[in-house]
């Protein structure tokens, strides 16, 4: 009997002490045997790594296939994922966040589907997990690249890496990296670019991954500081820019992809808006081509459309007047 292909599982670790034991146990207890685990500790300042090492000790049959990469300083989730990819040796690559967990048949089911269908990318449904239970999130957006790209740009398809499996040979051929230093929406941008590189996409109508939504210490949940939040918004703009340029270079920035991309760009630059005029001027010069989506984007209110229209025409005074009159 031929040996099953090796799967590399990449798990960035950052301040996940209350959750990481459950994550690690769910990965170690997979029904699939041939797994290489790469944990990338991005300089956590809690005891995540200690808990990780203690938990791994409970699985001696897996321990030889575990590698822990420790950053001497925080480098961000994008670089952590790139470091994991650089160290990967498996035929397939999967990802998990250290505060989430998976069902025991996840790897086996995804790899079997990829092998049978000769897929470069396989994605599946997932659970949003709350303290009072799970919510099933369906992800059936087909297996055609254009449809998948548009669904991801519109944020209908989740842009995460963790509900997807990738053939590593394809990743090497595609040559796409996470954008170092741009740690917001880095997974969405990466997945959009990869979907543009292959027609061999598979989908499984079943959920295995539990996306934990009650970790108040996660990076997304803790974006409260204004300066930090603005920096993250600029990182999002950078990821959107890299991905849209790539789609344009591939000749895909037309028709429904172009329309979806412009809405994606508009939503990214809208996050730059703050109370100061500098942020408004930054909005004006960021993705000006996306302004045509102002009156086609169903995700913004009529009042906000009018405000954006004033900015499009460089009428900051009228923007402030409307804000004053409407109180918002």
Spell out what each predicted region is.
Residues 259-270:
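Amphipathic alpha-helical repeat scaffolds of TPR domains
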Residues 1-237, 246:
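Nucleotide-sugar donor-binding/catalytic module of glycosyltransferases
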Residues 56-59, 174, 256, 304, ...:
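Residue-level recognition of alpha-helix termini/interfacial anchor residues
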Residues 251-261:
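All-alpha amphipathic helical-bundle segments outside canonical DNA-binding/catalytic cores
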Residues 209-215, 221-252, 270-293:
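Catalytic core of nucleotide-sugar-dependent glycosyltransferases
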Residues 71, 77, 160, 232, ...:
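General helical secondary-structure elements
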Residues 274-328:
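Membrane-interface aromatic/basic loop that binds lipid-linked glycans or pyrophosphate carriers
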């Amino acid at each position: 009997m031929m040996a099953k292909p090796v799967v590399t599982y990449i798990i960035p670790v950052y301040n996940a002490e209350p959750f990481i034991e459950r994550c690690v146990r769910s990965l170690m207890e997979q029904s699939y045997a041939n797994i290489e685990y790469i944990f990338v500790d991005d300089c956590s300042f809690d005891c995540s790594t200690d808990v990780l090492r203690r938990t791994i000790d409970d699985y001696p049959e897996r321990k030889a296939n575990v590698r822990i990469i420790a950053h001497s300083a925080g480098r961000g989730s994008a670089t952590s994922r790139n470091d994991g990819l650089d160290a990967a040796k498996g035929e397939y690559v999967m990802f998990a966040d250290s505060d989430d967990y998976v069902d025991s048949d996840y790897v086996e089911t995804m790899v079997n589907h990829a092998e049978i269908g000769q897929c470069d990318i396989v994605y599946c449904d997932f659970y949003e997990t709350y303290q009072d239970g799970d919510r099933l999130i369906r992800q059936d957006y087909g297996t055609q690249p254009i449809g998948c790209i548009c669904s991801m740009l519109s944020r209908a398809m989740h842009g995460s890496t963790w509900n997807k499996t990738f053939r590593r040979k394809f990743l090497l051929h595609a040559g796409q990296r996470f954008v170092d230093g741009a740690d917001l929406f880095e997974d969405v941008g990466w997945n959009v670019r990869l979907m543009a590189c292959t027609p061999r996409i598979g989908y499984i109508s079943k959920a295995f991954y539990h996306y934990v939504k009650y970790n108040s210490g996660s990076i997304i949940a803790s974006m409260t500081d204004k300066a930090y939040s603005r920096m993250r918004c600029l990182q999002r703009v950078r990821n959107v820019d890299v991905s849209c340029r790539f789609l344009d270079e591939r000749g895909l920035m037309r028709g429904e992809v172009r329309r979806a991309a412009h809405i994606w760009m508009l939503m990214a630059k809208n996050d730059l808006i703050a109370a100061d005029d500098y942020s408004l001027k930054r909005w004006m010069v960021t993705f000006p081509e996306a302004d045509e989506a102002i009156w086609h984007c169903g995700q913004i209110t009529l009042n906000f459309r009018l405000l954006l229209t004033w900015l499009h025409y460089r009428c900051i005074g009228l923007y402030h007047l409307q804000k004053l009159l409407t109180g918002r």
